[in-house]
From Swiss-Prot:
InterPro entries: eL8/uL1-like, Ribosomal_eL30-like_sf, Ribosomal_eL8-like_CS, Ribosomal_eL8/eL30/eS12/Gad45, Ribosomal_eL8/Nhp2, Ribosomal_eL8_arc. Part of the 50S ribosomal subunit. Probably part of the RNase P complex. GO terms for molecular function: ribonuclease P activity; rRNA binding; structural constituent of ribosome. One of its GO terms (biological process) is ribosome biogenesis. The gene is rpl7ae. GO terms for cellular component: cytoplasm; ribonucleoprotein complex; ribosome. Signal peptide: none annotated. Multifunctional RNA-binding protein that recognizes the K-turn motif in ribosomal RNA, the RNA component of RNase P, box H/ACA, box C/D and box C'/D' sRNAs. PROSITE patterns: RIBOSOMAL_L7AE (PS01082). Keywords: Cytoplasm, Ribonucleoprotein, Ribosomal protein, RNA-binding, rRNA-binding, tRNA processing. This is Large ribosomal subunit protein eL8. Belongs to the eukaryotic ribosomal protein eL8 family. It holds the Pfam family Ribosomal_L7Ae. It is found in: Cytoplasm. It comes from Thermoplasma acidophilum (strain ATCC 25905 / DSM 1728 / JCM 9062 / NBRC 15155 / AMRC-C165).
Length: 121
């Protein structure tokens, strides 16, 4: 069943790159996990990339994140499972994660943003 908050299909390779970026950014301590922290980072202009799980239940938990990201011009990407996203930030599951600082991974970040621009055209 397709979730109403999923606005586009993210190719598997882009999702995997996003998970890799989340994991490496987590090691530097520059990620926010959990919807409330993610919202704060977006509203404060700190977020560089938001990663949202597609299997969040109830969907209302993350329903407004894509619209908020678009309003604040923050790129966002989807991954299939919240368990996969959570494992990259040291918890069982995460509905959403905000990358505040991608550290030395600028090339990976740019490749994700570039791919997202192509998908949304």
């Amino acid at each position: 069943m397709e979730k109403s908050y999923v606005k586009f299909e993210t190719p598997e390779d882009v999702s995997q790159k996003a998970l890799d970026l989340v994991e490496s950014s987590y090691r530097t301590g520059k990620v926010k996990k959990g919807t409330n922290e993610v919202i704060k980072s977006i509203e404060r202009g700190e977020s560089k990339l938001v990663v949202i799980a597609e299997d969040v239940n109830p969907p209302e938990v993350v329903y407004y994140l894509p619209s908020l990201c678009e309003d604040k011009k923050v790129p966002y990407v989807y991954v299939k499972k919240k368990a996969d996203l959570g494992s990259k930030v040291g918890i069982a599951s995460a509905a959403s994660v905000s990358i505040v600082d991608y550290g030395k991974n600028e090339e990976l970040y740019k490749s994700i943003v570039s791919a997202l621009e192509q998908i949304k055209k």
